[in-house]
Amino acid sequence: MIRFILFISCFFLIGMVIECKDGYLMEPNGCKRGCLTRPARYCPNECSRLKGKDGYCYLWLACYCYNMPESAPVWERATNRCGKGK
């Protein structure tokens, strides 16, 4: 029983340490990467190219990716610069 508790504790500890981020892919101009007119596999392929686990076209408007590395640029409301120039 103690081994089981230790195993579960280690499992949760590893899960807390290894965190990945989710988010919308971002264009160089700071806007979300659109997917309305793209092929069906566009978003999952782009997410994989950036080392994400998976992705999809959210409401046919923008690519959303799961488990992206911390270094991958994703759109964030707090740092939004879309349409604001450089």
Swiss-Prot record:
Q: May I ask which residue range the UniProt record assigns to the signal sequence?
A: 1-20
Domain of life assignment? Eukaryota
GO MF, one term, reads: sodium channel inhibitor activity
Compartments, record wording = Secreted
Q: Which tissues is it found in, per the record?
A: Expressed by the venom gland.
- Per its UniProt record, what CDD domains does this chain match? neurotoxins_LC_scorpion (cd23106)
The LCN-type CS-alpha/beta domain sits at 21-83
Q: Which InterPro entries match?
A: LCN-type_CS_alpha_beta_dom, Scorpion_toxin-like_sf, Scorpion_toxinL, Scorpion_toxinL/defensin
Instruction: According to the UniProt record, list the residues that bear Lysine amide.
Output: K84
Main localization of the protein described in the UniProt heading: secreted
**Keyword list, A-Z:** Amidation, Disulfide bond, Ion channel impairing toxin, Neurotoxin, Secreted, Signal, Toxin, Voltage-gated sodium channel impairing toxin
The SS bond pairs are C31-C82, C35-C57, C43-C63, C47-C65
**A GO term from the CC aspect:** extracellular region
Q: What is the stated purpose of this protein?
A: Beta toxins bind voltage-independently at site-4 of sodium channels (Nav) and shift the voltage of activation toward more negative potentials thereby affecting sodium channel activation and promoting spontaneous and repetitive firing.
The free-text domain remark for this protein reads: Has the structural arrangement of an alpha-helix connected to antiparallel beta-sheets by disulfide bonds (CS-alpha/beta).
Q: Which family does it belong to?
A: Belongs to the long (4 C-C) scorpion toxin superfamily. Sodium channel inhibitor family. Beta subfamily.
Which named protein is this?
Answer: Toxin Td1
Organism (species): Tityus discrepans (Venezuelan scorpion)
Q: What is the phylogenetic placement of the source species in the record?
A: Eukaryota, Metazoa, Ecdysozoa, Arthropoda, Chelicerata
